[in-house]
Amino acid sequence: MTDREQGAEFVCAHIVFEGHAANPLANALPSCVCLPLATLPDCVPVLTLLFAEAQATNCGRQVMLDRLFEVVLIQLLRHLMELGSTQAGLITGLAHPQLRHALAAIHQTPAQPWSVESLASLAGMSRSVFANQFRDVVGETPAGYLQRWRIGLVQKWLKNGQPLRLIAEEAGYSSEPALSRAFKSQCGLSPKAWLVQEQQRSLDARP
């Protein structure tokens, strides 16, 4: 935020997405966004509170800053969707009037035995039109997106300590071996090896 008398003020944030570079939200964002505040009038009250909180030493300061940055990120994403400035991926798919219904179904009930036909029906499109539109807008096939979304959930549940047997059922896989095959195809490692790697990465990142 800038002031002609006092100059510019900066607040920096580091946002970590689950799955790192494989996160569908992170993949859809442009590498750099520079916007004047005049284009985001709804952000001004939130940013004013954010800057005040950043410069204060109040109780609960970090929790407040985390939540305020989340609000700013959501407002920024909405603005980018309106401008059509996002890359092919989750955000452009959610902005599509028909594809968003299929994406919402995948997100809400990933364990369902989704097929191109059933997803196309939710989108109100024919199978072929849906498959082509999905690939063009989201940047991958419906089956590819479904698997990546499921594996992202599997990674989250592994970190939470859930047993692989329950994870397989919740993620829509018929068995642990079926999940392990899909996981290795996506991540290059077995679920167990991936978890060990992530735990070591977390230890290495500690100061």
Residue ranges and their predicted role:
Residues Q75-M81, H101, A105-W149, Q162, ...:
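Basic/polar phosphate-binding segments, predominantly the helix-turn-helix DNA-binding elements
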Residues E18-H20, A38-H107:
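An amphipathic alpha-helical interaction segment
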Residues L158:
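Conserved A-loop
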Residues M1-C32:
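N-terminal regulatory/effector-sensing and dimerization cores
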Residues Q200-R201:
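PLP-dependent class I/II
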